[in-house]
Amino acid sequence: MENAFKLLYKTIEERKESPLPESYTNYLFSKGEDKILKKIGEECAEVIIACKNNDKEEVVKEMVDVFYHCFVLLAEKNIALEDVMREVKERNGKLSRVGDRREIDTL
């Protein structure tokens, strides 16, 4: 799975460095961070709706859209995927207790 993410991120970086006409990825880069963030928000809302509808297939599709748009944001912000993966690996296996988390009381 990690290879699929690496390949997707590499493609996004290539689009950023060498834009292709009619590329949706290039469209997002040309519109900038606000557009990318808006798309992430939209896709997250679609994940929520798919979950509420108990539509597993749609959840999977929408999660891929979330990952894609988050990867575009990472590339826009010049954050390497390896940095994110390193953080995931560092957190993997760590015991986290509910008491260690801040209370979520407002949105």
From Swiss-Prot:
GO CC field = cytoplasm
Chief location: cytoplasm
- Pfam families annotated for this entry? PRA-PH
| Annotated localization | Cytoplasm
Example of a GO MF term: ATP binding
Where exactly are the transmembrane stretches of this chain? none
One of its GO biological process terms is: L-histidine biosynthetic process
- Keyword annotations of the record: Amino-acid biosynthesis, ATP-binding, Cytoplasm, Histidine biosynthesis, Hydrolase, Nucleotide-binding
Q: Which family does it belong to?
A: Belongs to the PRA-PH family.
Q: Which Gene3D superfamilies match?
A: MazG-like
Pathway membership, UniProt: Amino-acid biosynthesis; L-histidine biosynthesis; L-histidine from 5-phospho-alpha-D-ribose 1-diphosphate: step 2/9
Source organism: Bacillus cereus (strain B4264)
| Its EC number(s) | 3.6.1.31
Domain of life where this protein originates: Bacteria
Name of the featured protein: Phosphoribosyl-ATP pyrophosphatase
Query: What does the record give as the reaction this protein catalyses?
Result: 1-(5-phospho-beta-D-ribosyl)-ATP + H2O = 1-(5-phospho-beta-D-ribosyl)-5'-AMP + diphosphate + H(+)
**CDD domains registered for this protein in UniProt:** NTP-PPase_HisIE_like (cd11534)
